[in-house]
Each structure stands twice: as structure tokens, then as C-alpha cells.
């Protein structure tokens, strides 16, 4: 499922090509989406309040989770921990961890994470986070300890904003601002 930043959520099938299966109309602007079990978590921002909305198959709202720093902007990206007990999101220069009820567990900041954007997590809970302005991808433990800079401008990054980890092939896909290319890096 993907959001278009508008009033629809597109359900797509991913194989060698993307195939749109159906569209779901929603009310309000949604900026991100995650899926677990039969539930969607949506990042909704109405210009005043940023909220994570948990919805059962997009039919019924199960829970609304107010997001810290909601007065600044919508979160740039978010993902769920592998055990689905935590929500990780980026906002400004921060990586924030909430429990599934919205309680803030930790906030991570680093000079290596300026303009925090895209975020993903591996099956061990290690977070991979893009710093658009620092031109980096860093690794952070679930406890909020930085493991290091994985990729930087020395590796050809320029304003990384989106990241996806394919654990089956040990590949990281990165999108960059003002580029229509997807960069692929293999983890060794």
C-alpha cells in the first residue's frame, strides 16, 4: 500500500512490475503508511497536529496516537519495530521512538543525521536512517546508540530522502531529492 500525499491510498502488487489492485478513498492528508497483520498505520497531518492512525483494513480506526513535535511539521518518515511494539519516526534532525501507545521512549540526535528523512529497520531492529543535509545513511540500535555512518557523500549520496531495505538480498535502495534514480547498495 502507498499513499499519494492526498486523499487516496493505493493498494499495489509488487513483482517485476507494480500493479495497482485498488484505490481506497480517505479523508485528510496521509503522508506515510505501514502495514502489519491486518492493520495499517497511517501518518496524518492536518496542518496543526501530526497523528499516527491505526486502522483495521482501512475500515475502522482502532487508535489515534498524537505525535510529539506535532507543531513543527509532519514526520518525514516512519517504520515499525519488528515486534510491532515501537514506532520510529524522523522529524527535523531527530529520530524518535514511541511505544505503540504513543509514549515517547527516546530521541536520538547526531551531527551525522542532519535533515533526518527516510527510515527503515532490519529484522534485528537495527535502524537505517537518511540524513538529507548531512548526506549520510546511519545505523542506530533500538536503544538509540549510533553504530556508525553506513553511507555518505563519499559513496555518491546526494540529499538522500528515502530508504528501503531488502533483507532477502541484503540490498539497500535509496532515493534522493531532485533525482529520479534509485541507488542500490549491497550490504556485505
How would you label these PLM feature ranges?
Residues 26-44, 68-86, 90-93, 112-126, ...:
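Beta-rich, blade/repeat-based domains predominating
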Residues 1-6, 35, 42-49, 81-82, ...:
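Conserved beta-strand positions in repeat-built beta-propeller and related beta-rich domains
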Residues 158-188:
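Blade-level signature of beta-propeller repeat domains, shared across WD40, Kelch, NHL, RCC1
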Residues 89-92, 96-97, 103-142:
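Loop/turn-rich, solvent-exposed surfaces of beta-rich toroidal or solenoidal domains
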Residues 13-17, 55-59, 99-103, 141-145, ...:
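Short loop/turn segments that connect beta-strands within beta-propeller blades
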Residues 9-10, 50-53, 96-97, 106, ...:
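WD40 beta-propeller blade core
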Residues 6-39:
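Asp-box/WD-like beta-propeller blade repeats and closely related beta-sheet repeat scaffolds
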Residues 17-25, 60-70, 103-109, 146-153:
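A short beta-strand motif characteristic of beta-propeller blades
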Amino acid at each position: 500500500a502507498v499513499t499519494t500525499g492526498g486523499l487516496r491510498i493505493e493498494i499495489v502488487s509488487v513483482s517485476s512490475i507494480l500493479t495497482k489492485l485498488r484505490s481506497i478513498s480517505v479523508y485528510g492528508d496521509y503522508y506515510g503508511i505501514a502495514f502489519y497483520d491486518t492493520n495499517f498505520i497511517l501518518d496524518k497531518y492536518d496542518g496543526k497536529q501530526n497523528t499516527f492512525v491505526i486502522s483495521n483494513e482501512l475500515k475502522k480506526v482502532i487508535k489515534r496516537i498524537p505525535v510529539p513535535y506535532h507543531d513543527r511539521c509532519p514526520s518525514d518518515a516512519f517504520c515499525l519495530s519488528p515486534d510491532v511494539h515501537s514506532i520510529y519516526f524522523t522529524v527535523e534532525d531527530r529520530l524518535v521512538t514511541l511505544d505503540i501507545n504513543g509514549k515517547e521512549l527516546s530521541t536520538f540526535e547526531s551531527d551525522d543525521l542532519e535533515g533526518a528523512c527516510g527510515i527503515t529497520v532490519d529484522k534485528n531492529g537495527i535502524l537505517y536512517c537518511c540524513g538529507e543535509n548531512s548526506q549520510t545513511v546511519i545505523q542506530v540500535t533500538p536503544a538509540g546508540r549510533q553504530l556508525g555512518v553506513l553511507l555518505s557523500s563519499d559513496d555518491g549520496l546526494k540529499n538522500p530522502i528515502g530508504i528501503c531495505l531488502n533483507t532477502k538480498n541484503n540490498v539497500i535502495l535509496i532515493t534522493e531529492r531532485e533525482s529520479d534514480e534509485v541507488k542500490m547498495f549491497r550490504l556485505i
